[in-house]
Amino acid sequence: INIGDWSSDVCSSDLVLFTVLGIPFHKWLRWPRTPFICTGLTLAVLSIVMILYGSFVGRTRFEVKEVTYTSPRLPQAFDGYRIVQLSDLHIGSWQGNTPAIRKLVDLVNAQQPDLIVFTGDLVNHRAVELNDFQEILAGLKAGDGVYSILGNHDYGPYFHWKSKQDQDNNLIELKQRQAAMGWKLLNNEHTFLIQGNDSIALIGVENQGEPPFSQHGDLPKAKAGIEGMFKLLLSHNPTHWRREVLPESDIDLMLAGHTHAMQLQLGNYSPSVYIYPEWGGMYLEG
């Protein structure tokens, strides 16, 4: 299986430039020429530049990162099967920038995937965030379709709702919008992917985060009745892997999102590593 996921990275190759640019400011302000002051000024300039770059430039530099997954349990018919994983669009953060999402959809479709999976957090808070993007996202195409799961933001827990009923209605609307886009939402359930005479199970659980994040997932229910098959699990929060999936199930492969690399990635480094043992890329166990 070839799995591609998209990301937008903060570029680290230009950082030296801004270290040099700090020198004239130092002289102009006539600050004491101590290593401590110089280091502090440089770090401050770098932080501001990186934030601005990531916010306005880096986030639209979509990249496809290809990973090849192999397993003796994977049926032969799935050799070369192509999956594109998308996650954490937080579509409300793209208001006024529909061209970027069109660019993303075109990039995904150009991979000619057999399957597209979306691993949660489609919105920040409300389903109406999709108003300008629903038709665009409906353009995602794959041979076996688009499957999705819910992330912690999709339940609307961080918005001040007038009532619990309003929050519940928002979730219903979000599910309806995904269906209208042609996305097949897996809520603690599974389906089968078929190639020739072979098949594998695609399992999706609702958000199953570590506290304080919400826990709606029901893995035993989602995988009931598919013993012995190769199992591909979609679960939003990567900590679910070590908390339940690894010790209590026979899942072969899990795809997750959620971490965002803590909004900062320089090469292969992200501060996420101090919170999430698995924060980006492929990890093998056993």
Range-by-range predicted roles:
Residues 11-22:
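Hydrophobic cores of alpha-helical transmembrane segments in multi-pass inner/ER membrane proteins
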Residues 21-30, 60-61:
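Membrane-interfacial segments
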Residues 1-11:
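Single conserved hydrophobic/aromatic residue that forms the stacking wall/gate
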